[in-house]
A protein has these predicted regions:
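Papain-like cysteine protease catalytic cores
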Residues: 1-120
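Deubiquitinase catalytic domains
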Residues: 70, 74-195
């Protein structure tokens, strides 16, 4: 469920990864100058080790990072707030052995109620919001988005035993996923490569 997924994301977040997500924009979105920050709690990070301790600008910047990191975690914990997919895109797509070892290509197909043609849009964050572009070597996770709700698209195969495929790949070729491979190569990959 959503609560468990958010708790898992919080448990794997590190300040060193956080500074890179969304091209560093999460710091700008979530820091608060009013926060009281004790950097001593965060001395065992790669980011801290790159600081010049005598440089006041470095210390101020590191306090912004810590503030943003803590506020982002509080944001994720709040079940009343809507979490825009752009905040989570890099967390989900970046390789992380505790989440998705190879990372993912996240493909969100949006259904709009105001489109009389029943078209489905492909949602893709701009380079401003992500470090992750489509990579054919990563597995692809498909989601359907309608309003603020997301549902995964899985493939189910029945044979000697039921098998559920949660991600798809251009490189795993089998008769059972040939249609998905064609969609990835002919529609999804060219769309993402245009951006």
């Amino acid at each position: 469920n959503i609560k468990d997924f958010k708790e898992h994301i919080i448990s794997i977040l590190t300040i060193d990864d956080f500074v890179n997500y969304n091209n560093g924009n999460l710091i700008r979105y979530f820091y608060d100058l009013e926060d009281e920050i004790d950097i001593n709690e965060y001395k065992n990070t790669r980011t801290y080790k790159t600081l010049k301790i005598n440089n006041e600008e470095d210390i101020i910047y590191y306090k912004k990072i810590i503030s943003a990191f803590n506020n982002f975690i509080e944001f994720l914990k709040d079940d009343e707030l809507f979490i825009d997919y752009t905040y989570l895109w890099d967390i989900i797509c970046t390789p992380n052995p505790k989440l998705f070892a190879k990372g993912l290509n996240l493909i969100i197909m949006e259904i709009s109620d105001d489109d009389i043609t029943n078209n489905i849009g492909i949602v893709c964050p701009t380079n401003y919001h992500t470090n992750n572009i489509y990579n054919a070597r990563k597995p692809c996770l498909f989601l359907i988005k309608k309003d603020d709700y997301y549902e995964p698209i899985y493939s189910r195969f029945e044979g000697n035993k039921i098998s559920i495929m949660k991600t798809f790949s251009e490189y795993k070729v089998s008769s059972s996923n040939q249609e998905m491979k064609n969609i990835l190569q002919k529609i999804i990959k060219p769309y993402f490569n245009k951006l």
